[in-house]
Amino acid sequence: MKKATSLSELGFDAGDASSGFFRPVSGDSSTPTSQHHRRRLTKVSVIGAGNVGMAIAQTILTRDLADEIALVDAVPDKLRGEMLDLQHAAAFLPRTRLVSGTDMSVTRGSDLVIVTAGARQIQGETRLDLLQRNVALFRKIVPPLAEQSHDALLLVVSNPVDVLTYVAWKLSGFPASRVIGSGTNLDSSRFRFLLAEHLDVNAQDVQAYMVGEHGDSSVAVWSSVSVAGMPVLKSLQESHRCFDEEALEGIRRAVVDSAYEVISLKGYTSWAIGYSVASLAASLLRDQRRIHPVSVLARGFHGIPDGTTSSSACPPRRPRRRPGRREMELTEEEAKRLRRSAKTIWENCQLLGL
């Protein structure tokens, strides 16, 4: 019996087979492949390739949120190394184009720009001095970013995030609806985790928010905390489990201190903020209408001074949509604490003279 020496001798015609696997491209504008029917490609830029920036980029990549990710950093060798490390995993990841550069031109045409770059605090340096250095850095990077991507959404992650969100808004020239900060989105996740541990439930079944400053003065909104629709404070009362203001403040304090604990153990935080920002990116890019506590320009929220950027629960969305902001219901004590927290942010903003 004669052995076949080619696919054609087996009756398999390569030309015919290719037509089965690959659809011909037509220049006819009425075909589904025309420009009118093509899905618009999504581009996300991450400014700063440090631990936080790369955790964000990696999480956005694995969640398949963008068709192109641009990485920008001032250190070219580290930047290229980070990009190559991700590119080498291409066989295991969604198909996403990765580009990098030290120049802001690589971000051109971005839909979402995420800023993680920031100066690190020097020993003995005051918070105000650190803030002034970060403002100087933002003066260098924000205007070029705005110039490269006129219609982008700007998401600030650098700390102090509430004040720097205000700075980015002022320097970009963008409307306030297109500049937000990561705010207390991560604080709220930590809050939900700690409550879930206390109550022995899944954190995804806990509804709880931290608002105000992303920092020491953040406010836990206990009045709206619920598990499976049951208000937590009411549930504790009905089960005769003891709690008092001191216990509640202890949990809030644990939320605030949790970042310091992670830093003391591993030197920095990265993964939690990576997932937090990726969740914001998904909500913004896909218009999911999910509620997030993010830093936004507060205009009359519970008596907070106009021009203050502070975290409030709202559904961040593309500006073409109707405004998503809605005022949370707070007790008078919670509103008082929120105003006190916002005052700290407002005072720092006034010192900058922007």
UniProtKB/Swiss-Prot annotation:
Induction: By hypoxia. One of its GO terms (molecular function) is L-lactate dehydrogenase activity. Pfam families: Ldh_1_C, Ldh_1_N. Residues 302-332 are annotated as: Disordered. The active site is at residue 214. The keyword Coiled coil does not apply. NAD(+) binds at residues 73-78, 120, 159. Its EC number is 1.1.1.27. SUPFAM superfamilies: LDH C-terminal domain-like, NAD(P)-binding Rossmann-fold domains. Keywords: NAD, Oxidoreductase, Stress response. It is an enzyme of class 1 (oxidoreductase). Pathway: Fermentation; pyruvate fermentation to lactate; (S)-lactate from pyruvate: step 1/1. GO terms for biological process: lactate metabolic process; pyruvate metabolic process. Signal peptide: none annotated. Substrate binds at residues 127, 159, 190, 269. GO terms for cellular component: cytoplasm. InterPro entries: L-lactate/malate_DH, L-lactate_DH, L-lactate_DH_AS, Lactate/malate_DH_C, Lactate/malate_DH_N, Lactate_DH/Glyco_Ohase_4_C, NAD(P)-bd_dom_sf. It catalyses: (S)-lactate + NAD(+) = pyruvate + NADH + H(+). Homotetramer. PANTHER family: L-2-HYDROXYCARBOXYLATE DEHYDROGENASE (NAD(P)(+)), L-LACTATE DEHYDROGENASE. Belongs to the LDH/MDH superfamily. LDH family. This is L-lactate dehydrogenase. The lineage of its organism: Eukaryota, Viridiplantae, Streptophyta, Embryophyta, Tracheophyta.
